[in-house]
Each structure stands twice: as structure tokens, then as C-alpha cells.
């Protein structure tokens, strides 16, 4: 609990939520439905019913593009829990890397483009390269990597 009282942790948590809200807004602007219309937490639940994409297909396509999400049921779900109509997206890992709202817009664009090209594995490879480039700008353990000259 001591960490939660730290000013840096409070700032981090505010950024996690800000990132989730911004990511949500970008996806809504592109015509995606967010369960509850948005988010006030670190997670958002994307309902893909209006896009005729299953949660399982979205999870697999995004994974091949280097974006980790989880398939998830949505309210009034009609599909099997092994297939689902939604995906769950969280922002803590992105925020931990130092990403902010500007980067959430880029992540949203890559999610949108991947789902629009869900049947195109070559497109997923291109997106995976873009994801790697973005992550390289925000390395985990940057201090350790620079100290030891890791690439």
C-alpha cells in the first residue's frame, strides 16, 4: 500500500486512465462500440458485433500483429464463450512504457487497421513492425538497457 501513496504512482494511475479514455475515444470515432460508451478505468471492452468480427478472430489477428488483447463476452452475448463478440483492451502495460495519449492514437489506428484487414496476414506483419518500432521508442527498463548497451 505504501507504493499507492507515492506521488509517482498517483501520476501513473491517472495516466493509465487517461490513456484508456483516449484509446476508447479514438476507437469510437472510427465506428467501434465500447460497452458502456467509454471507460473510467484501465480497461475497455470493445463490442465487435457491428463489425461482424468475432472476439476470437480479433484476438488472433491482433496477436499476429503484435497487439495483445483478450477475447471477451459482451452484454447480451449470442456467441459461445470460446468465440465471443468482444475484446478487452488494457492500458497499464503501455503506460508503464511511458506512452501517453499521442501514442494511444497510434495504437488505436493500428488496432483499427488490423481489424479492417483481418484476413490479410501480410498486413499483420507490417503492423507488427510498426508496433515494434513504437515499443522501441518506449523500452521497458530503459535505464538497464542503456547501462548494459542492450538493443
What are these regions (language model features)?
Residues 33-87, 91-98, 149:
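Conserved PLP-binding catalytic core of the aspartate aminotransferase-like
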Residues 12, 40, 58-60, 73-74, ...:
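Composition- and surface-driven signal marking solvent-exposed, interaction-prone regions
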Residues 2, 21, 28, 49, ...:
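Hydrophobic alpha-helix feature that most strongly marks membrane-spanning transmembrane helices
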Residues 18, 81-151:
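PLP-dependent enzyme catalytic core of the Aspartate aminotransferase-like
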Residues 3-6, 24-30, 52-57, 90-92, ...:
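Short, charged low-complexity intrinsically disordered segments located at boundaries
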Residues 4-12, 43, 90-96, 116:
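Short beta-alpha connecting loops at secondary-structure transitions
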Amino acid at each position: 500500500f505504501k507504493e499507492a501513496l507515492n506521488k509517482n504512482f498517483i501520476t501513473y494511475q491517472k495516466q493509465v486512465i487517461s490513456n484508456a479514455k483516449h484509446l476508447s475515444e479514438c476507437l469510437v470515432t472510427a465506428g467501434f462500440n465500447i460497452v458502456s460508451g467509454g471507460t473510467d478505468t484501465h480497461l475497455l471492452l470493445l463490442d465487435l458485433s457491428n463489425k461482424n468480427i468475432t472476439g476470437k478472430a480479433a484476438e488472433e489477428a491482433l496477436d499476429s500483429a503484435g497487439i495483445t488483447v483478450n477475447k471477451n463476452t459482451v452484454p447480451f452475448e449470442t456467441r459461445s464463450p470460446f468465440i465471443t463478440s468482444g475484446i478487452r483492451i488494457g492500458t497499464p502495460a503501455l503506460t508503464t512504457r511511458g506512452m501517453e495519449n499521442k501514442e494511444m492514437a497510434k495504437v488505436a489506428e493500428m488496432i483499427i487497421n488490423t481489424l479492417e484487414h483481418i484476413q490479410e496476414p501480410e498486413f499483420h506483419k507490417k503492423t507488427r513492425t510498426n508496433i515494434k518500432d513504437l515499443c522501441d521508442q518506449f523500452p521497458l527498463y530503459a535505464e538497464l538497457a542503456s547501462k548494459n548497451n542492450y538493443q
